[in-house]
Structures are given as structure tokens and as C-alpha cells.
């Protein structure tokens, strides 16, 4: 299994157990980012009702049961709120830091990043109110933000990650 970690904080933020798709359904963004679909799951109930009828099992769930988004729960992501102005300042700094990282570690990615990052960020800024932002476990604002949005009538959000802000670790 591959786990994706933030290049600046080593926060685990995703894994290859989630199918990667084109961000926002746009294949042009695929060279710089990927999108994964989340699911809801039930957390906290020790009695799974294995021997019971499944309808009875749901009725019998205790007060300690909660519905969670799998990605948020598995990787201890925390929602954060930013104004559009704060986000613009953050993303400018973050993109410069990624560019510097690429120049040092992956010079072959520099031109692709320069070409593809701007349209992606423009899309996010244009649709700013549709997004919720998440941070990794360290809650470090130097790390990459994870972008969450709802596609169409889906009941769980999709999460978008900037690929050059991550590295893979195999387990």
C-alpha cells in the first residue's frame, strides 16, 4: 500500500486505497493534482449486530455512534476556515515553496508545475465558496491544504490533493 504524505510536514493525508480521478472532472488538472471520492462510515459502536437483523442493528446503535467521512477520520484531517483573501496569501506562499522544492528535488517537474498550477488555483478561487479546506494531523499552515467539495448530488465530498505537495511512502 502507498501512503501519500505532505512534503513539508510528513502528515499522512491519503492512500492508494482510494481511486484517483481527474480533479473536477478536468483531465488537464491531472498532471498537477488528483481527486478521490470519500465515503461515510459508522464509528464508535462496539455492537455490530452480527447475529441480528440489520434493521434491528441500526435501531440498536448507541449514543456513542457517529457518522464520519472515511478520509477525514483515517488521516485525522481537520477542517479549517479561510477567507478568500487569506487563502490567496496562503496559496501564493505555498506554491512558491513547492516550486523551490521542485527546483531542488525534481527539476523535470518545474515547467509542468508552472504551467498547470495557475489554472488549477484560478478554478479554486473562482469556485471558492464551494470548497471546504482541510489540514493534516500536524495542523501546520506550512503544509498543503486539502480541498473538499461536493460533486453534483453526491452525499459525501470529494477531496483534491496537489500532487507535487506530496510524496509516496510504501508500506
Swiss-Prot record:
Primary residence: cytoplasm
Keyword Cytoplasm: yes
Localization, UniProt: Cytoplasm
PROSITE patterns: TCTP_2, TCTP_3
Residues in TCTP domain copies: 1-171
Family: Belongs to the TCTP family.
Described function: Involved in calcium binding and microtubule stabilization.
The protein's name: Translationally-controlled tumor protein homolog
Species per Swiss-Prot/TrEMBL record: Plasmodium chabaudi chabaudi
Gene transcribed to yield this protein: TCTP
Amino acid at each position: 500500500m502507498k501512503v501519500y504524505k505532505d512534503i513539508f510536514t510528513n502528515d499522512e493525508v491519503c492512500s492508494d486505497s482510494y481511486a484517483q480521478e481527474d480533479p473536477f472532472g478536468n483531465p488537464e488538472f491531472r498532471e498537477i493534482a488528483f481527486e478521490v471520492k470519500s465515503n461515510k462510515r459508522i464509528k464508535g459502536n462496539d455492537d455490530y449486530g452480527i447475529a441480528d437483523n440489520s434493521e434491528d442493528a441500526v435501531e440498536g446503535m448507541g449514543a456513542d455512534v457517529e457518522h464520519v467521512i472515511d478520509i477525514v477520520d483515517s488521516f485525522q484531517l481537520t477542517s479549517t476556515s479561510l477567507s478568500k483573501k487569506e487563502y490567496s496569501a496562503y496559496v501564493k506562499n505555498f506554491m512558491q515553496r513547492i516550486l523551490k522544492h521542485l527546483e531542488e528535488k525534481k527539476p523535470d517537474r518545474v515547467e509542468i508545475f508552472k504551467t498547470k498550477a495557475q489554472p488549477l488555483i484560478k478554478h479554486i478561487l473562482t469556485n471558492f465558496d464551494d470548497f471546504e479546506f482541510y489540514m493534516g494531523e500536524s495542523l501546520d499552515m506550512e503544509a498543503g491544504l486539502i480541498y473538499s467539495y461536493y460533486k453534483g448530488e453526491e452525499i459525501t465530498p470529494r477531496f483534491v490533493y496537489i500532487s507535487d505537495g506530496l510524496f509516496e511512502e510504501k508500506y
